[in-house]
């Protein structure tokens, strides 16, 4: 595990973004953990989050020209990631979409830089992949191509079939999905910290049952 990944896990736990217990998911499954990136809701939270996204991009080696944040959650994520990259001397344009088109002023449903070249999509998680598919449609309609997807957490969990939602996106569009952390790293962290020993066992059992 890299330093930025351990720091991100610790910070997510501290901010109650990553919690352990018993949670009923939309899928109906009972999960021993829950990740809610919406609780990164202060300026400092976004600062720390942006550093983790920038570190994940640097490690991934992804080749891209512009950052895109799907409305709504992806908008602040793309914005702060672009800022963190600029701090590291890697300034990239960014854009996001509106849910509704405007018929006055700045027209269209894209705000920010024009979508062109290779586009990196930044979001919090991929659950069903719907937002990512919509983003790819928007990107291609603008004449650009998706370069990959960057998310905070890869649950490494099967969907309805044998593949995870992330694997389905990778297979369908032929693009990589990069995450700051994966469930296996969360599990490693839990195992290495005695205070989380009980949670480690529950997460490991869940991963054995639903993992990919």
From Swiss-Prot:
Keyword Cytoplasm listed: no
Transmembrane segments: none
A Pfam family annotated for this UniProt entry: Pribosyltran
Gene3D superfamilies: 3.40.50.2020
Top EC class, one word: transferase
GO biological process, any: 'de novo' UMP biosynthetic process
GO annotations of cellular component type: cytoplasm
Residues the record lists as binding orotate: 34-35, 127, 155
GO terms, molecular function: magnesium ion binding; orotate phosphoribosyltransferase activity
Keywords: Glycosyltransferase, Magnesium, Pyrimidine biosynthesis, Transferase
InterPro entries, per database record: OPRT (IPR023031), Or_phspho_trans_dom (IPR004467), PRibTrfase_dom (IPR000836), PRTase-like (IPR029057)
Record: residues binding 5-phospho-alpha-D-ribose 1-diphosphate: 26, 72-73, 98-99, 102, 104, 123-131
Known cofactor(s): Mg(2+)
Claim: Mitochondrion is one of the keywords in the record: no
Function: Catalyzes the transfer of a ribosyl phosphate group from 5-phosphoribose 1-diphosphate to orotate, leading to the formation of orotidine monophosphate (OMP).
Subunit structure: Homodimer.
Protein family according to the UniProt entry: Belongs to the purine/pyrimidine phosphoribosyltransferase family. PyrE subfamily.
Protein name, as recorded: Orotate phosphoribosyltransferase
């Amino acid at each position: 595990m890299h330093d930025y990944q351990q720091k991100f896990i610790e910070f997510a736990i501290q901010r109650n973004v990553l919690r352990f217990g018993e949670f009923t998911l939309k899928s109906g499954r009972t999960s021993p953990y829950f990740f809610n990136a919406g609780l990164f809701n202060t300026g400092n939270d976004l600062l720390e989050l942006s550093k983790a996204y920038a570190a994940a991009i640097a490690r991934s080696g992804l080749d891209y020209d512009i950052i895109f944040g799907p409305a709504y959650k992806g908008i602040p994520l793309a914005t702060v990631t672009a800022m963190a990259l600029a701090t590291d001397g890697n300034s990239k344009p960014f854009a996001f979409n509106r849910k509704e088109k405007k018929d006055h002023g700045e027209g269209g449903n894209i705000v920010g830089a024009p979508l062109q070249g290779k586009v990196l999509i930044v979001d919090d998680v991929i659950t069903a992949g719907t937002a990512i598919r919509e983003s790819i449609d928007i990107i291609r309609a603008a004449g650009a191509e998706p370069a990959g997807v960057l998310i905070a957490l890869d649950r490494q969990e099967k969907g309805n079939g044998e593949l995870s939602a992330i694997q389905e996106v990778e297979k369908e569009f032929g693009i990589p999905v990069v995450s700051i952390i994966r469930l296996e790293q969360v599990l490693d962290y839990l195992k290495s910290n005695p205070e989380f020993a009980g949670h480690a066992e529950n997460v490991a059992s869940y991963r054995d049952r639903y993992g990919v």
